[in-house]
Regions:
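Glycine-rich phosphate-binding loops of nucleotide-dependent enzymes
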Residues: 1-192
Length: 192
Protein backbone atom coordinates (compact mmCIF):
# COMPACT_ATOMS: atom_id res chain seq x y z
CA UNK A 1 0.00 0.00 0.00
CA UNK A 2 2.71 2.44 0.99
CA UNK A 3 4.70 1.86 -2.20
CA UNK A 4 1.67 2.24 -4.46
CA UNK A 5 0.58 5.40 -2.66
CA UNK A 6 4.02 7.06 -2.72
CA UNK A 7 4.98 6.73 0.95
CA UNK A 8 7.91 4.38 0.22
CA UNK A 9 10.06 3.88 -2.86
CA UNK A 10 10.12 0.36 -4.33
CA UNK A 11 13.32 -1.57 -3.61
CA UNK A 12 12.98 -3.45 -6.90
CA UNK A 13 10.62 -3.74 -9.83
CA UNK A 14 8.69 -1.04 -11.66
CA UNK A 15 5.26 0.55 -11.45
CA UNK A 16 3.34 1.59 -14.54
CA UNK A 17 0.50 4.04 -15.08
CA UNK A 18 -1.11 4.22 -18.51
CA UNK A 19 1.64 1.94 -19.83
CA UNK A 20 4.44 4.27 -18.72
CA UNK A 21 6.86 3.64 -15.85
CA UNK A 22 6.29 5.95 -12.88
CA UNK A 23 7.82 6.57 -9.49
CA UNK A 24 6.39 8.62 -6.68
CA UNK A 25 8.61 10.55 -4.30
CA UNK A 26 5.69 11.31 -1.98
CA UNK A 27 1.94 10.65 -1.60
CA UNK A 28 1.05 13.91 -3.34
CA UNK A 29 2.75 12.62 -6.53
CA UNK A 30 0.59 9.50 -6.39
CA UNK A 31 -2.55 11.58 -5.84
CA UNK A 32 -1.67 13.76 -8.83
CA UNK A 33 -1.57 10.57 -10.93
CA UNK A 34 -5.07 9.67 -9.70
CA UNK A 35 -4.15 7.14 -7.01
CA UNK A 36 -6.24 7.46 -3.84
CA UNK A 37 -5.85 5.38 -0.71
CA UNK A 38 -8.67 4.77 1.76
CA UNK A 39 -7.36 3.21 4.93
CA UNK A 40 -9.13 0.78 7.23
CA UNK A 41 -11.06 3.39 9.16
CA UNK A 42 -11.67 5.75 6.25
CA UNK A 43 -9.48 8.64 7.30
CA UNK A 44 -12.46 10.65 8.50
CA UNK A 45 -12.60 13.04 11.43
CA UNK A 46 -15.46 12.15 13.81
CA UNK A 47 -15.82 15.63 15.32
CA UNK A 48 -16.00 17.40 11.96
CA UNK A 49 -19.03 17.73 9.71
CA UNK A 50 -19.61 15.69 6.58
CA UNK A 51 -18.89 18.76 4.41
CA UNK A 52 -15.65 19.55 6.26
CA UNK A 53 -14.52 15.90 6.07
CA UNK A 54 -15.30 15.67 2.39
CA UNK A 55 -13.14 18.71 1.59
CA UNK A 56 -10.43 18.34 4.27
CA UNK A 57 -7.35 20.00 2.80
CA UNK A 58 -9.16 21.27 -0.31
CA UNK A 59 -11.92 23.45 1.14
CA UNK A 60 -13.99 25.60 -1.22
CA UNK A 61 -13.85 29.27 -0.30
CA UNK A 62 -15.79 32.43 -0.99
CA UNK A 63 -14.68 36.03 -0.80
CA UNK A 64 -11.76 37.87 -2.35
CA UNK A 65 -8.04 38.12 -1.77
CA UNK A 66 -7.04 37.73 1.87
CA UNK A 67 -10.70 37.81 2.94
CA UNK A 68 -11.63 34.33 1.76
CA UNK A 69 -13.57 32.08 4.10
CA UNK A 70 -14.72 28.47 3.99
CA UNK A 71 -17.84 28.14 1.83
CA UNK A 72 -19.79 25.83 4.14
CA UNK A 73 -22.96 25.83 2.02
CA UNK A 74 -21.10 24.80 -1.14
CA UNK A 75 -19.07 22.14 0.70
CA UNK A 76 -22.17 20.67 2.33
CA UNK A 77 -24.16 20.67 -0.91
CA UNK A 78 -21.44 18.94 -2.93
CA UNK A 79 -20.61 16.44 -0.16
CA UNK A 80 -24.25 15.38 0.29
CA UNK A 81 -24.78 15.11 -3.48
CA UNK A 82 -21.66 12.98 -4.00
CA UNK A 83 -22.40 10.65 -1.09
CA UNK A 84 -25.98 10.20 -2.29
CA UNK A 85 -24.70 9.26 -5.76
CA UNK A 86 -23.16 6.23 -4.06
CA UNK A 87 -26.52 5.26 -2.59
CA UNK A 88 -26.30 6.74 0.91
CA UNK A 89 -29.62 8.54 0.69
CA UNK A 90 -30.15 8.97 4.43
CA UNK A 91 -27.41 11.61 4.53
CA UNK A 92 -29.15 14.87 3.76
CA UNK A 93 -27.31 17.35 6.01
CA UNK A 94 -23.69 18.23 5.35
CA UNK A 95 -23.43 19.83 8.80
CA UNK A 96 -23.99 16.47 10.47
CA UNK A 97 -20.98 15.18 12.41
CA UNK A 98 -19.21 12.19 10.87
CA UNK A 99 -19.02 10.58 14.32
CA UNK A 100 -22.76 9.88 14.01
CA UNK A 101 -22.32 7.82 10.83
CA UNK A 102 -21.96 4.06 10.72
CA UNK A 103 -18.61 2.54 9.80
CA UNK A 104 -19.94 1.66 6.35
CA UNK A 105 -21.15 5.21 5.79
CA UNK A 106 -17.76 6.58 6.81
CA UNK A 107 -16.03 4.28 4.31
CA UNK A 108 -18.53 5.34 1.65
CA UNK A 109 -17.84 9.01 2.41
CA UNK A 110 -14.10 8.41 1.97
CA UNK A 111 -14.64 6.56 -1.32
CA UNK A 112 -17.01 9.25 -2.65
CA UNK A 113 -14.42 11.90 -1.73
CA UNK A 114 -11.66 10.04 -3.60
CA UNK A 115 -13.85 9.68 -6.70
CA UNK A 116 -14.89 13.35 -6.60
CA UNK A 117 -11.27 14.48 -6.49
CA UNK A 118 -10.38 12.50 -9.61
CA UNK A 119 -9.15 9.13 -8.41
CA UNK A 120 -8.61 6.62 -11.19
CA UNK A 121 -7.09 3.96 -8.94
CA UNK A 122 -8.65 3.33 -5.55
CA UNK A 123 -6.59 1.44 -2.97
CA UNK A 124 -8.86 0.16 -0.20
CA UNK A 125 -7.10 -1.19 2.88
CA UNK A 126 -9.41 -3.55 4.79
CA UNK A 127 -12.52 -1.45 4.05
CA UNK A 128 -14.87 -4.01 5.63
CA UNK A 129 -12.82 -4.68 8.78
CA UNK A 130 -14.71 -4.12 12.03
CA UNK A 131 -18.01 -3.68 10.16
CA UNK A 132 -21.20 -5.63 10.72
CA UNK A 133 -22.69 -7.79 7.98
CA UNK A 134 -25.10 -5.10 6.74
CA UNK A 135 -22.43 -2.37 6.77
CA UNK A 136 -19.91 -4.61 4.99
CA UNK A 137 -22.49 -5.45 2.31
CA UNK A 138 -23.08 -1.73 1.80
CA UNK A 139 -19.34 -1.06 1.36
CA UNK A 140 -19.11 -3.93 -1.15
CA UNK A 141 -21.95 -2.33 -3.14
CA UNK A 142 -20.07 0.99 -3.09
CA UNK A 143 -16.90 -0.73 -4.33
CA UNK A 144 -18.81 -2.35 -7.19
CA UNK A 145 -20.32 1.05 -8.04
CA UNK A 146 -16.82 2.57 -8.16
CA UNK A 147 -15.74 -0.23 -10.52
CA UNK A 148 -18.83 0.36 -12.66
CA UNK A 149 -17.76 4.01 -12.97
CA UNK A 150 -14.43 2.90 -14.43
CA UNK A 151 -12.14 3.06 -11.41
CA UNK A 152 -9.47 0.44 -10.92
CA UNK A 153 -9.84 -0.90 -7.38
CA UNK A 154 -7.17 -2.60 -5.31
CA UNK A 155 -9.14 -4.23 -2.50
CA UNK A 156 -6.98 -5.48 0.36
CA UNK A 157 -8.75 -7.89 2.70
CA UNK A 158 -8.46 -11.05 4.76
CA UNK A 159 -12.11 -11.86 3.99
CA UNK A 160 -12.14 -14.24 1.01
CA UNK A 161 -15.91 -13.86 0.52
CA UNK A 162 -15.59 -10.07 0.34
CA UNK A 163 -12.78 -10.34 -2.20
CA UNK A 164 -14.83 -12.75 -4.32
CA UNK A 165 -17.82 -10.36 -4.23
CA UNK A 166 -15.92 -7.47 -5.81
CA UNK A 167 -12.78 -8.86 -7.45
CA UNK A 168 -11.92 -9.76 -11.03
CA UNK A 169 -8.23 -10.55 -10.53
CA UNK A 170 -6.72 -11.83 -7.29
CA UNK A 171 -3.26 -11.92 -5.78
CA UNK A 172 -2.77 -13.82 -2.54
CA UNK A 173 0.17 -12.57 -0.50
CA UNK A 174 1.97 -14.43 2.26
CA UNK A 175 4.56 -12.35 4.12
CA UNK A 176 4.72 -9.93 1.20
CA UNK A 177 5.34 -12.55 -1.49
CA UNK A 178 2.78 -13.56 -4.11
CA UNK A 179 1.54 -17.06 -3.28
CA UNK A 180 -1.21 -17.16 -5.92
CA UNK A 181 -2.30 -15.01 -8.87
CA UNK A 182 -5.54 -15.84 -10.67
CA UNK A 183 -8.72 -14.48 -12.25
CA UNK A 184 -12.29 -14.80 -11.04
CA UNK A 185 -13.63 -18.25 -11.80
CA UNK A 186 -10.20 -19.91 -11.91
CA UNK A 187 -10.41 -21.11 -8.29
CA UNK A 188 -13.13 -21.89 -5.80
CA UNK A 189 -13.33 -20.21 -2.41
CA UNK A 190 -12.28 -23.47 -0.80
CA UNK A 191 -9.18 -23.74 -3.02
CA UNK A 192 -8.10 -20.24 -2.07
Amino acid sequence: INTLSGVHQPTRGEMYTDGKPVSFSNPKNAQEMGIATVHQFGGTYPLMSIGRNFFAGAEPTKGFGPFKIFDRQKANSIAVEQVQRFGITRITDGDRLVGGLSGGERQSLAIARAVYFGARVLILDEPTAALGVKQAAHVLRIVNEAKRRGLAVIFITHQVMHAMAVGDHFAVLIRGAIAADFRKGDKTREAI
